[in-house]
Swiss-Prot record:
GO terms for cellular component: cytosol
UniProt similarity note: Belongs to the RimP family.
Subcellular location: Cytoplasm
Predominant subcellular localization, coarse grouping: cytoplasm
Pfam families per record: DUF150_C, RimP_N
Its biological purpose: Required for maturation of 30S ribosomal subunits.
Protein name, per record: Ribosome maturation factor RimP
Highest rank taxon of the organism: Bacteria
Keywords: Cytoplasm, Ribosome biogenesis
Encoding gene (name): rimP
Transmembrane domains' residue ranges: none
InterPro entries membership: Ribosome_maturation_RimP (IPR003728), RimP_C (IPR028998), RimP_N (IPR028989), RimP_N_sf (IPR035956)
Region annotation Disordered: where it falls in the sequence: 66-85
HAMAP family given in the database record: RimP (MF_01077)
Length: 163
């Protein structure tokens, strides 16, 4: 579906999400015919705490009510799917990085280097991470000095679940 069809949907969904104190991460109608799904991804606007399922369920009901009232989705019926980014997410914006401070991130640089590090700070154009090194299995883990990583030097980055 083209972006001009998404605009009325977003215009209905975004104020509902904002009124709930959340950030609209994504709003996309996928599929065709009878198998269409409106996927809405919501998150907390800032902070590092997790978005609870009860809060997602509450905003999902409010979104559903607004969509029924405004009817911005043309064509056949669709299924509404509202979720949060979850424990592992792609880090694409400074806000994503700020939401992940304190957690592990897996980074792949433009040069092809891959590593996992703890995210210590997140700024508008860079992050500060701390890698660790374990020389041999069973030996203590050594924390390396914090290092600056410019977002422009990163090909991909994801938050990681800790063991």
């Amino acid at each position: 579906m083209s972006s001009e069809h998404h605009a009325p949907i977003r215009a209905t969904v975004e104020p509902v999400v904002a009124a709930a104190g959340l950030h609209l991460e994504e709003c996309e109608l996928k599929g065709q015919g009878a198998t269409r799904t409106l996927q809405v991804l919501v998150d907390l606007p800032d902070g590092t705490e997790a978005l609870g399922l009860d809060r997602v369920a509450a905003v999902a009901q409010e979104i559903s009510d607004a969509l029924d009232r405004d009817d911005p989705v043309p064509g056949p019926p669709y299924e509404l799917e509202v979720s949060s980014p979850g424990a592992t997410r792609t880090l694409e914006t400074p806000r994503h990085w700020r939401r992940t401070v304190g957690h592990l991130v897996r980074i792949r640089t433009l040069e092809g280097e891959r590593y996992t590090a703890r995210l210590l700070e997140a700024h508008e154009d860079h992050a500060v991470v701390q890698r660790s090194h374990q020389p041999k299995k069973g030996m203590p883990v050594k924390l390396l000095d914090p290092e600056r990583v410019d977002y422009a030097s990163i090909r991909t980055a994801r938050s990681e679940v800790e063991n």
